[in-house]
Amino acid sequence: MKELTSSQVRQMYLDFFKSKGHSVEPSASLVPVNDPTLLWINSGVATLKKYFDGSVVPENPRITNAQKSIRTNDIENVGKTARHHTMFEMLGNFSIGDYFKNEAIHWAWEFLTGAEWLAFDPEKLYVTVYPKDTEAKRIWRDEVGLSEDHIIDVEDNFWDIGAGPSGPDTEIFYDRGEEFLDIPEDDPENYPGGENERYLEIWNLVFSEFNHTPEDTYEPLPHKNIDTGMGLERVVSIIQDAPTNFETDLFMPIIHAVEALGTNVKYGDAPQTDVSFKVIADHIRALSFAIGDGALPSNEGRGYVLRRLLRRAVMHGKKLGINEAFLYKLVPVVGEIMVSYYPEVLQQKDFIEKVVRTEEERFHETINEGLSMLNEVIKEVKDAKGDTLDGKIIFKLYDTFGFPVELTEEVAEDEGLKVDHAGFETEMEAQRERARSARSKETSMGVQSALLTDIKVESKFVGYTELTHDSELFVIIQGDALVNEASAGTAELIFAETPFYAEMGGQIADRGYVKNTAGEVVANVVDVKKAPNGQFLHKVEVLAPLAEGQIYQLQVDERMRTRILKNHTATHLLHRALKDVLGEHANQAGSLVAPGHLRFDFTHFGQVTSEELARMEAIVNEKIWEAIPVVTIETDIDTAKNMGAMALFGEKYGKEVRVVNIGDYSIELCGGTHVANTEDIGIFKIVSESGIGAGVRRIEAVTSKEAYQLLQEEERQLKEIATLVKSPQLKEVVTKTEQLQQQLRDLQKENEQLAGKLANQQAGDIFKDVKDINGVRYIAAQVNVKDMNQLRQLADQWKQKELSDVLVLATAQDEKVSLLAAMTKDMNGKGLKAGDLIKAIAPKVGGGGGGRPDMAQAGGKNPAGIADALAEVENWLANA
């Protein structure tokens, strides 16, 4: 076996399959692009679903990749097992209807055992096969030459995730030797494929032969596929003779960096601290890559996953004695390890560090909140003479605050309490079940369709230079079938050439007409999409007979196209302006280019200020008024990148690409349609800016006529305001409004002073009405004040004058009730709490509340219940 680094293994794999005619597909973003079914890219095949389900036909049916992936099921096992990770790399080779079992098996064996490649000892390799897959077994035995005792039948060797491609698979295992056997020799699991550490699975070859239909039947696929996956971390652990994946060069530099933080704890000192080192190393890899790909910590979706990973890593840092923000210091270490194939982490190092550090510092504040909650719960348990912390509370601390169960156990043990492990496990299992349900929905692929996939005719787009074009009608599809003619209803058409732009890249499809040679409109074009083999598929409403093989005139709606051109070029200017104002991290996360408006989604950590929006808008308009020529060129992808063209991360580009140059200001890869000069846009106006998800914000804007109409509407509204504030000239509106605001403030201040005097008068009356129950002096009264703030002011007066032991006040405004309860420290010392009192009386007014032992408040919706609430005070005190 050769001595290789992880970088060498990755590159060797890609080089091997490139030599077998495969195209190397770059690793896609961890954040799925145009796939709402996935939370994360979780396998090498996840980015290729469109090829496997037949919705798109690849340029080369042979594909290989090294794909970064994230799986977050069983996060709590990370660090405790030898090979469980949140982020990992999957090496894969794929065939879309090209080669099948024979080549897949032979090439796998060649890569593993060939002297030019990994050079594994063949005697250490075992394979498992599906019992009914006699062909795979025959190839392994008769062609590869494996002995029968190295081929094991396993019933589970059938890959099936619901509707979509499915089929048998064969798995390859490496025998690490008897020293790795972690179960008794006679254990039934002691075999390749069993639950043991001796036989390590390194490669899974899936033979997709069937469509698993929604009706739960299995039908032969029109095109059989190969989908393989080899875990890089596992293979490297074998090559580098590492006991677990964590002792490889993918993780050890991170672990050493944690050791260097000066806590005097070293990796290998103890199993417990080793777990913490592993968790930190694993989680910072996932965080660095995910944030670099545009995901940001939040309380929902993938942002919640990142927040949970970061908090778990911070808590394990505390176990190593690290009590300050430290994870951000590890980001450059991750970047250096992966830079040979994933330069993006180092390229975005500053931004990733900023996000991680900010989140760490916030969590240190949250930890204190969690400890406060835990201490409160412990006190309640002790007050109730209990001895066990409820499992739901433990889970809430774990899930919300990132508290490891062990930490809760330690605190509870110090307080002489036990923990409800069974209750905690019940909550954990419920969460796992929710995750499993989500994954079962996420991972299924569409059922493969043969109709469009088998249409091979070429269809050329001529719409960059023409809006009207005569072309032969090649294909008519109606009712999911190929037909020779159509005379009514809806149909899908493919022409030899077309000026109609198909919906893609955020730009909506053109609309227009199909005319016959007599100039009569025979169909309205209502939508255009790309077919699997790249043809332009026109969805039409048929008005008169259409026949295959005839020549028709295709006419794009010129007015609509012109409006789209302006908005598309404006999005390019806006994209560059965003980066100029907010920073290079502000990447496009989605867009819509329609005739009436444009929408641009972008990644950004934090709010966008009104000043920043104004600067962006000004920059775009300046570029419009500079009358910059917009030049498009067609070139190869490498040349385009060398030109500095901005590629949208996660998008797939072919060998030939279009580069849109707006002078030297903006250079982007784009297949859309654009104006010839920025001055054609006219004017640009931002309509709104908002957050739409974790770390993703949206700008909506208009150009040209729509921008002018918006400005007209804003001017009309301004004139209305001028009339309302009695300002004869628009330029005086601001001054007049400021004067009115000052008058309003003066009146509010005067009103508050009057209200205060009235409250003082009421206080004089109510403070005289002191009642007594069982030696407790109390005041309970309804007062006429406007809000809770004035109730608190009355309570402050009561406290200063020490007029009674207990005070309860109520007020009602606009059908809303406010209640306040206050108690002296003497009452608190006797076990009475204002919070308990308020909880007892609040239901009478249809509400609830709480607070401190000395003061509490509540709200309600039933003013009619105030009298009952105040009467309940005496009952509560009598029984307290």
Curated annotation (Swiss-Prot):
Alphabetic keyword roster: Aminoacyl-tRNA synthetase, ATP-binding, Cytoplasm, Ligase, Metal-binding, Nucleotide-binding, Protein biosynthesis, RNA-binding, tRNA-binding, Zinc
Residue numbers binding Zn(2+): 568, 572, 670, 674
Keyword tRNA-binding: yes
Broad class of where this protein is predominantly found: cytoplasm
PROSITE patterns: AA_TRNA_LIGASE_II_ALA (PS50860)
Subcellular location: Cytoplasm
Keyword Zinc: yes
Cofactor binding comment, as recorded: Binds 1 zinc ion per subunit.
Gene Ontology CC terms: cytosol
Reactions catalysed according to its record: tRNA(Ala) + L-alanine + ATP = L-alanyl-tRNA(Ala) + AMP + diphosphate
Cofactor(s) needed: Zn(2+)
Top EC category: ligase
Gene Ontology biological process: alanyl-tRNA aminoacylation
EC code: 6.1.1.7
Annotated function: Catalyzes the attachment of alanine to tRNA(Ala) in a two-step reaction: alanine is first activated by ATP to form Ala-AMP and then transferred to the acceptor end of tRNA(Ala). Also edits incorrectly charged Ser-tRNA(Ala) and Gly-tRNA(Ala) via its editing domain.
Family: Belongs to the class-II aminoacyl-tRNA synthetase family.
UniProt cross-references to NCBIfam families, sorted A to Z: alaS
Entry domain remark: Consists of three domains; the N-terminal catalytic domain, the editing domain and the C-terminal C-Ala domain. The editing domain removes incorrectly charged amino acids, while the C-Ala domain, along with tRNA(Ala), serves as a bridge to cooperatively bring together the editing and aminoacylation centers thus stimulating deacylation of misacylated tRNAs.
Protein name in UniProt: Alanine--tRNA ligase
